[in-house]
Curated annotation (Swiss-Prot):
Compositional bias of kind Polar residues: 89-109, 125-134
Tissues expressing this chain: Expressed in the pharyngeal glands.
Example GO biological process: nematode pharyngeal gland morphogenesis
Region feature (Disordered): 70-109, 122-303
Domain of life (superkingdom): Eukaryota
Gene: pqn-8
UniProt organism field: Caenorhabditis elegans
Protein name: Prion-like-(Q/N-rich) domain-bearing protein 8
Amino acid sequence: MPPILLTFLLFSNVYANFMNMLMGSSSAPLQQYRAYAGCSSSGCVPATIVPKSSGFWPNADMIAGLQTEQRSQNQNQNSNNPQQDDPRTSQSTGQINGNVPGSSSSNQQPVIYIARAGSDKYKNSEVTTSTPTPNGFNFGNGFQGGQNQNTGFSSGFFNNQNQNSNQNLNQNNFQQNQNLGASSGFFNNQNQQNSQQNQVNGPTSGFSNQQTSNQNSGFFNNQNQQNGQNFGNSGNQNGVNPYSGAFSNGQNQNQQGFFGNNQNNQQNSNGQVQGSQNNQIWNQNQNPNILPFGPNLVNSNTQFGPQPFQPIQVGSIRQPFSNKDWNFQPGGQAVQFVGGGGSGGAPGSQSVPMTDEAQQIAVQIQAIRDNLSITRNESNYLINQLKLSLPQELQNQLEMV
């Protein structure tokens, strides 16, 4: 056979295989996708759960699993697959997506998809660095990373981190409260100091004389580091005029504006805000590369720059995982199971013991909660969807997880 003809046939074969792979119709057999197959002897980790629409695939096993799932979405090959209907619960509850055996249509609602997480060579998702990004949704720190504690969006949902010291020398028959760092709106504040020491006992009137420091404003946090506003109908105990009315003679220092820090070091007799340094959207004394809202999914010092707010995207192929997100083994002592019967010293107990399958699902739930590349709301949504897609006996075992 002439060499040029042999080269042409070889090229044709390679091209045909490449096009079949692109079209999802490769004749090469793929390993059967099993949601709860466990780990092989090669040392894989249990299944990892990611949203189907995220576009985030840490390794080739997930891509192969998705291809197999798409090819067999109208077949019920595995009753444990949460993307397919369980005949005991699907028609009565409608909680499981997929196709009931024997039916001709499928409920197309892409929710979640479970795939085996693969070997260690995919541990960092095609990136070489192992340093996690400092920005984004970190638990307890809301819309900013843990290194930013003085900007508007500084703390998480319903998570007070007040470090105030309160010295209340007032004698008020009705209320002796100094509400320091009182939360209002959707975000709480991280107040770090309180310099209000009220030593003047002005005339009280009814339920007035309520001295509130570091008061929140609207939906954003005011992190006032000194004196805030003095509220009340009358009898505000201000050092200038003890008979002042509401909002008068307030000495507002470092009072925040609506979007940024108004660093006001002036004494204001009207109780209004006079921001001498209004930095608008973000603080000048903070990192100028960090936006005060939205997850920064990529380091701001890279070529991609700060990313806009993308609530649907839960990860990036460029973002590495920390090692702890991949070190889960079914029944391992490193995982704390919440619910009876599991290993690792469960803080709670149940009457129904956990089966091996339920323990592996508990490992997946733990992996969702510890994964810093998604938000808490997204992880709670995934966990709820996962539980709803399981048979009822597994839901009972995972009730407290």
